[in-house]
Curated annotation (Swiss-Prot):
Protein name, UniProt field: Pantothenate synthetase
Family the UniProt entry places it in: Belongs to the pantothenate synthetase family.
Reaction(s) this enzyme catalyzes, per UniProt: (R)-pantoate + beta-alanine + ATP = (R)-pantothenate + AMP + diphosphate + H(+)
Further comment: The reaction proceeds by a bi uni uni bi ping pong mechanism.
Positions that bind (R)-pantoate: 65, 159
Function: Catalyzes the condensation of pantoate with beta-alanine in an ATP-dependent reaction via a pantoyl-adenylate intermediate.
NCBIfam families: panC
Organism of this sequence: Corynebacterium diphtheriae (strain ATCC 700971 / NCTC 13129 / Biotype gravis)
Keywords, sorted A to Z: ATP-binding, Cytoplasm, Ligase, Nucleotide-binding, Pantothenate biosynthesis
One function term, GO molecular function aspect: ATP binding
Chain's gene name: panC
Annotated active site: 38
EC number: 6.3.2.1
Lineage of the organism: Bacteria, Bacillati, Actinomycetota, Actinomycetes, Mycobacteriales
Amino acid sequence: MTSITHTISEIQKLTRQAISDARPVVLIPTMGALHEGHLSLVDTAYSLELDNPFVIMSIFVNPLQFAAGEDLDSYPRTLDADAAKLATHNHQVHAIFAPSPAEMYPLGPRTTITPGAAALRFEGATRPTHFAGVLTVVNKLFQITQCQHAIFGEKDFQQLALIRQMVADFNLPVHVHGSPLMRDHDGVALSSRNAYLSDTERVEARRISAALRQAAMFHVKHDIIAAAINAMAGMDIDYIDVVAPDFSEPTAGNELYGDARIITAVKVGSTRLLDNMAVNVEKPNA
């Protein structure tokens, strides 16, 4: 049976007991409105083959990561439906932590994390306060739950890289695991914001993953990007690029070759959609 907790003291009581029982604590942070992509994070937690893990899913629409004019107020909040989905999933979530903003920030967000240079590009350029909010709440969740493992989806690839950076820079005793990006039957990357799309916009959104698949057939960085842009001609592309898995910037003598990601954000109607795909970058022929 899944416990639903709303206070820090409640979830800490459960995690203290789990730690006392020598059970590894696994945290899956989400904002709710669960879909199959979120459920796959639970499957990833169990794929770690830990001994009797205590699995927590946090469901919290974090106001710190939304800027003025974004969809904080309209973001779907479906705790009862989320709990029902978890109850019927084939792998158990032992506790849901669903705090209020007042519970997480009783005196307001007085102390926040500055993510650094890697957060200034791509999502950070469009949403300059976003990653400070993400890293602040993730760090709080790590401290509250005292988790040893945390699962994050690879759809938000820049976010995953920044969380790994924070863990390394702050020497946090947490193993961060990426869970593969999940797609719907039509190839669209699973996202809670897909619910905003009209039927016509949904058809348009399919072009994004199709473009990335076409781009991944190429191996020179310029050709990869050009193929994706051509395949998404006429779409409202925010950014598209090929990046290192850790989002480090290539330098002279240390160019990006080998395993990489093509990442993009595209606006379809009023909805910004993120997607990415693994690519292999080779040196161009002389």
